[in-house]
Amino acid sequence: MDYKTAGVDVEAGRAFVNRIRKSVEATHRPEVVGGLGGFGGLMRLPAGLKKPLLVSGTDGVGTKLELAQDHGGHHNVGIDLVAMCVNDVITSGAEPLFFLDYMATGALSPEAMATVVEGIAEGCRGSGCALLGGETAEMPGFYPSGRYDLAGFCVAVVEEEQLIDGRQIRAGDRILGIASSGIHSNGFSLVRRVLTHAGANAETTFGPSNQPLIESLLTPTQLYGRLVKTLLETGTPIHGMAHITGGGLPENLPRCLPEGLQAIVTPSSWTRPAIYDWLQSHGDIPERDLWHTFNLGIGYCLIVPEEGVSIAEKACESEGMQAWTIGRIEASSGGDGKGSVLGLPA
């Protein structure tokens, strides 16, 4: 008996590492020290920082992975993994520095795993951060053969005096909603349930233009890092930011609001993507559940003073992203308490 007969293929692991090497190294920033294969990734802090704060985040892709593995969407979930982490840490105004990934699988498929890492590398390049290392765990008997799970870890940096933490938010500020690219990576346990209930398959289409349903669902999560960097470099006065993930607008907008303020959102200010109408009609999903599960077309929010709206809109346009003024900030009715979101289904 040997390790391979026990279910762990060391040679396949080596082939996997050799295939991903170029993709990984292509993400490296000038601050990276050394290459792939060491026990730990090394990186210098960018030069010129006076009082740097490190910002960390970790996340996964959830059960979107099952849909991706059933339909060959390995590359896309690699991008998703980066986006879920990077989009969180940039809400503080931080610049992503490096990313680490963890993959666990029942039996290593070098082709599929390498495709995932190539997606991760694409996400890192699109976010300006280095893929500094990772771990691939082959765990026969623990995970089914051909199935894998992913986790990502991101570290970013921001000057302490430039930290965006919501303390500057004031009544009268505007909420700018940035378009999502689709469902992103939240709510897929409900999505999969609806797909099963509706008998949907790879041939199913939706909407007036008959878009392929599965392909649309597997669209990668939008990366907002470059946009935020552009906004900050052009001097856009950003008072707060929110990444709209699980819980939707009602549960994520309040996370950046200080005591005594609330958000007033106008749902008619943007057009809800057709995918949500399909899910609601085929799954009989209550309106409130839609709002508390999905992003409904808004993947990221900026809170800016009224005079900053046009600046932010131009920056979004320059990055090819659609944006709408979707609401405003007001004093909460009691004058205290940490933010709520009004204007949405209760």
UniProtKB/Swiss-Prot annotation:
GO terms for biological process: 'de novo' IMP biosynthetic process; adenine biosynthetic process. GO terms for molecular function: ATP binding; phosphoribosylamine-glycine ligase activity; phosphoribosylformylglycinamidine cyclo-ligase activity. SUPFAM superfamilies: PurM C-terminal domain-like (SSF56042), PurM N-terminal domain-like (SSF55326). The lineage of its organism: Bacteria, Bacillati, Cyanobacteriota, Cyanophyceae, Synechococcales. This is Phosphoribosylformylglycinamidine cyclo-ligase. The keyword 4Fe-4S does not apply. It comes from Synechococcus sp. (strain CC9311). The gene is purM. Its EC number is 6.3.3.1. The keyword Cytoplasm applies.
